[in-house]
Design a protein with these regions (language model features):
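C-terminal engagement/docking regions of AAA+ P-loop ATPases
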Residues: 1-27, 37-53, 225, 230-237, ...
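Amphipathic alpha-helical interface segments
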Residues: 241-245, 249
Length: 320
């Protein structure tokens, strides 16, 4: 378990591209009620911070980044709860650890308790599961929303359980009931992918040259088109691989000319071009055709659940 101060979290909402609608809903539904309770409760007793928020969708779409930014922007104390923290070999010790987590959260409130891959620790209860696992889930739910969940003056505690998963169907129904705010973070559509490209490449030198036929050497529209089916993480890695191509070329040219590598200068490296994304080591090239189609099919189960959100349903295009 890690207790993190908001100032120690380096991620803000400005660092996340393509999820503006979800970010605005998180501000209105979580941050403001959590940090300005007097404003919301003074208007209506219904306007309290939610007891739980669930971010679900395919891997690499920004769920963990949203959680970090939410903790930073809210100014609330952030508890990063690892699954291993709740696991002990002695009978009953895991229950005590759960109670200790909530005791700390109450003393530090407003608090956000983040559980990544929440389905692994709070999955569906089954008749054949180990007794200790069932007791941990029962203790967690009791501390979260039970007789001891209110403050000493009878008010609502300002503790928000924030979970992230790509297997929402495996989470116990009682847990889902305690998480009234659910946000699908699905694969980005064209406009979202463009925002991700713009944000990722904002500090990268771009080749502004125009070809003889009028096409730009760096065509972001082409990248947006062929990256359909890629997650935000995939796009970032593709940009990272592409940004290395001009540097690799410059180093190779220096070696061939016999010049001293100590004299290498960053300003002599050419700008990024569209072709850098499709070379032998280009990130998009590696995800194109069969590999990308297999990846997309493997995500269908989660994608169907998340399709009600702002995700992409576009067909993947090949780049010739």
């Amino acid at each position: 378990m890690e207790v993190v101060s908001p100032g120690e979290i380096p991620v803000t909402f400005e660092d996340i591209g393509g999820l503006d609608e979800i970010i605005e809903e998180l501000r209105e539904g979580v941050i403001y009620p959590l940090t300005l309770p007097h404003l919301y409760s003074g208007h209506s007793s219904l306007l309290t911070a939610p007891s739980g928020v669930l971010l679900y969708g395919p891997p690499g779409c920004g769920k963990t980044m949203l959680a970090k930014a939410l903790a930073r922007e809210s100014g609330a104390c952030f508890i990063n709860l690892h699954i291993s923290t709740l696991t002990e070999k002695w009978y009953g010790d895991s229950n005590k650890l759960v109670a200790a987590v909530f005791s700390i959260a109450r003393k530090l409130q407003p608090t956000i308790v983040f559980i990544d891959e929440i389905d692994a620790v709070l999955g569906q209860r089954r008749s054949g599961e180990h007794e200790a696992s069932g007791m941990v889930k029962a203790e967690f739910m009791t501390q979260w929303d039970g007789l001891t969940s209110a403050t000493t003056d009878g008010g609502n505690q300002r503790i928000c359980i924030l979970g992230a998963t790509n297997r929402i169907q495996d989470i116990d129904e009682a847990i889902l009931r305690r998480m009234p705010k659910k946000f699908p973070v699905s694969l980005p559509n064209a406009s979202q992918r463009r925002q991700i490209f713009d944000l990722t490449l904002k500090d990268t030198r771009i080749d502004a040259t125009v070809c003889s036929d009028g096409r730009p050497v760096f065509d972001i529209s082409a990248l947006v088109r062929v990256s359909a089916g890629m997650s935000g993480s995939d796009i970032k890695e593709a940009c990272r691989d592409a940004a290395m191509v001009p540097v690799r070329e410059h180093i190779k040219a220096l070696k061939q000319s016999g010049r001293n590598m100590r004299g290498i200068r960053a300003e002599n490296v050419r700008g990024l071009q569209t072709e850098d994304f499709f070379g032998r080591r280009g990130g998009i090239h590696q995800l194109q055709q069969q590999d990308l189609k297999k990846t997309t099919r493997s995500r269908d189960e989660v994608h169907e659940v998340a399709s009600a959100g702002s995700g992409s349903t576009e067909q993947v295009d090949d780049f010739d």
